[in-house]
């Protein structure tokens, strides 16, 4: 289940430190609050919940089961949206991965905490979203988004093989997720069609990478040595127990091969036969099965299935290959309205208020539905030219230029670069120099949808932990997980919305603050 070399389990039980300095990639800004800055990120909302899980969710049906437990489809009692809950037995662990001496179960539990810590840190449109964590004497409960489309594996069984456009759109999303993971020093180690889910059965354009139980943090100077993975997709260097993050690229190459011809490059009657072929690394493009497949596709497969991982392409290089660029979707004229609205909403957003930032990010990342996010998610992925799951200054400028090419909607905007700098200053909540997926969704979505009374009430209740009807600075410090921030800074944050100067924020003041940060009108 584990994430070796990961953050400590204490990060899961508490909250992630969000106190950063003002130095960042690509952008420099002045410190506020006497040099103190508070970074906002979606992971701060994922905490181990108190109480029984049955008080928050009720079971609809079982979705599946495995060695560690089962996955249930559940509904929220407050909000009624569907979630998938991974139920992990505390008494279960892979005895083959541990010695039989002491503290086996403790080690297993530590790895689960590490998996949770990893999932908290991820914010990408093609990676599973974690919402809540519960724990009792017998089980861990991981509450995630529910994807009704099933596994990519099922699509492969039903369709046998895919045309190059469909295959390219699938691979672009998988590689984008892997590229994002690798840039954050995370290796998945079990990429396979069973761990790729579809949001719905009618579209291949929104897939999710799931099951980070074998994932690990890595460093460039340290070779991974655990032999983990699934026979068809395991890289030869993993069998030798000396490898790096490029083992994920090999797995992607195997998936791409299967998508285009319907069978794996390394087959066999059993795992032992398959592994023998993987160890040799020899595969072929059968003429009859591959005669109508482009040379660009074969070239990319060869790059990803290069036996020597030192010579193998990276996920980013694969993502920017000729085949992906030729066959995968890009921004077109039909995207004009959504793109225009997204850029307009970012321009109008005033993100100086930290409490408002935290509230809008919570609503956008945790309370919106897949359907509500669909169009903006598609635009985000198309703007993300290098596929790393983040928008940088160059990509935002290109977005403006693309829109101008369609129609002179932004003719009054004279200095695009200056405008993009302002957008990054306002929308980059976590101060990393990029606009992350959840930041983009939260700021770009129509506020008439985002700011329903129910969602504003749920956001307010997130801060009002003692249910007193007022938000205090102590509650803010607890949510942000910061103990080193000065009292003056918290007073400033509270004062952003405290209209009656009672050193607390009631619901009416909270709503007023939220409506001030951006105009309701879309572009």
From Swiss-Prot:
GO terms for cellular component: cytoplasm; host cell plasma membrane; motile cilium; plasma membrane; symbiont-containing vacuole membrane. GO terms for molecular function: ATP binding; calcium ion binding; protein serine/threonine kinase activity. The modification Phosphoserine is found at residues 65, 117, 216, 219, 334. A lipid is attached at residue 2 (N-myristoyl glycine). Residues 345-363 are annotated as: J domain. InterPro entries: CDPK_Ser/Thr_kinases, EF-hand-dom_pair, EF_Hand_1_Ca_BS, EF_hand_dom, Kinase-like_dom_sf, Prot_kinase_dom, Protein_kinase_ATP_BS, Ser/Thr_kinase_AS. The active site is at residue 190. Myristoylated. Myristoylation and palmitoylation are required for the localization to the parasitophorous vacuole membrane. Palmitoylated. Palmitoylation increases in merozoites in response to low level of extracellular K(+) in the host blood. Myristoylation and palmitoylation are required for the localization to the parasitophorous vacuole membrane. Activated by calcium. Upon calcium binding to the EF-hand domains, the C-terminus of the junction domain (J domain) undergoes a conformational change which results in the dissociation of the pseudo-substrate inhibitory motif from the catalytic domain. This, in turn may facilitate the autophosphorylation of the activation loop at Thr-230, which leads to the kinase activation. A lipid is attached at residue 3 (S-palmitoyl cysteine). Disruption phenotype: In the mosquito midgut, male gametocyte exflagellation is normal; however, the rupture of the host erythrocyte cell membrane is delayed. Fertilization is normal, however zygote development into ookinetes is arrested at the retort stage where ookinetes are still immotile. In arrested ookinetes, protein levels, but not mRNA levels, of a subset of proteins including MyoA and MTIP, two components of the motor complex, CTRP and SOAP are strongly reduced. Residues 371-406, 415-450, 451-486, 487-520 form the EF-hand domain. A motif (J domain interacts with the EF-hand domains) lies at residues 353-363. The junction domain (J domain) is composed of 2 motifs that maintain the kinase inactive. The N-terminal autoinhibitory motif acts as a pseudosubstrate inhibiting the catalytic domain while the C-terminal motif binds the EF-hand domains. Calcium-dependent protein kinase which acts as a sensor and effector of intracellular Ca(2+) levels probably in part downstream of cGMP-activated PKG kinase. During the liver stage, involved in sporozoite motility and thus in sporozoite invasion of host hepatocytes, probably together with CDPK4 and CDPK5. In the mosquito midgut and during the last stage of male gamete exflagellation, may play a role in the rupture of the host erythrocyte membrane. PANTHER family: SERINE/THREONINE-PROTEIN KINASE. Belongs to the protein kinase superfamily. Ser/Thr protein kinase family. CDPK subfamily. This is Calcium-dependent protein kinase 1. The gene is CDPK1.
